[in-house]
Every structure is written in C-alpha cells, then in structure tokens.
UniProtKB/Swiss-Prot annotation:
It comes from Alopias vulpinus. A lipid is attached at S1 (O-palmitoleoyl serine). It is found in: Secreted, Extracellular space, Extracellular matrix; Secreted. The gene is WNT-7A. The keyword Glycoprotein applies. InterPro entries: Wnt, Wnt7, Wnt_C. Belongs to the Wnt family. Forms a soluble 1:1 complex with AFM; this prevents oligomerization and is required for prolonged biological activity. The complex with AFM may represent the physiological form in body fluids. Interacts with FZD5. Interacts with PORCN. This is Protein Wnt-7a. SMART domains: WNT1. Pfam families: wnt. GO terms for cellular component: extracellular space.
C-alpha cells in the first residue's frame, strides 16, 4: 500500500528553571544524617537520621547531608570566609553584587559619593 508507520519516543528534561526550583525545594527539605560505624569497620555501615522525631525516612530521591553548610554572610575565620558585612553592593543590580543578595536580608546603609578628577579634556 506504500504507507509507513513509525513510532518515535523520547524523554525530555524539564526546563532549567523548573529543575532549579525542584532542586531548591529538595535542598530546603534535606535531612541531616550521621554515619554509623561498627567497631570493626572504618567505613560507615549506614546513615542514621540526626533528629529522628521530626523527620521521616528519606526516599532515594531525597537529599541528605552530614554537615551543615557554612553561612557565607557571616565572617568565619576557620573557613577563611570574610562574609559580606561592610562590602560595597549595588542597590539597583539584580546580579551577585546586589544589596538584597549580598546583605542576606539584614538591610543595608546607603552612602552617596562624589568624585572629582582631572579628565585631560582637549578642545
């Protein structure tokens, strides 16, 4: 008859922004665990939930962590992080140097500066 039927299947990843939202949600719901070793083994045998009363058992798709992330907004001499306090930020920016992002929601002081310099203009 000359007709041809073809079936093509494929899977697509979600849009990058949607994936970011999913990961952020999983990050916010991550459960702290601690490795449990037996006397003979140096490697951990399993991970135990650190606060078992307030959490359910994590699923394979959930995120878990062993140590809390450092707070990069505060100075931490142990990690060498200088924090963001006292650094200059851009009030109108939506990038990494924005005041809202750098100041971690603590608010910020604004200062207006004037600068005069010789421009060596020629007429």
């Amino acid at each position: 008859s000359g007709s041809c039927t073809t079936k093509t299947c494929w899977t697509m990843l979600p849009k990058f922004r949607e994936l970011g939202y999913i990961l952020k949600e999983k990050y916010n719901e991550a459960v702290q665990v601690e490795p449990v070793r037996t006397h003979r083994n140096k490697r951990p045998v399993f991970l135990k939930i650190k606060k078992p009363l307030s959490y359910r058992k994590p699923m394979v798709t959930d995120l878990v962590y062993i140590e809390k992330s450092p707070n990069y907004c505060e100075e931490d001499p142990i990690t060498g992080s200088v924090g963001t306090q006292g650094r200059m930020c851009n009030k109108t920016s939506s990038q990494n140097n924005s005041c809202d992002l750098m100041c971690c929601g603590r608010g910020y002081n604004t200062h207006q500066y004037s600068r005069v310099w010789q421009c060596n203009c020629k007429f």
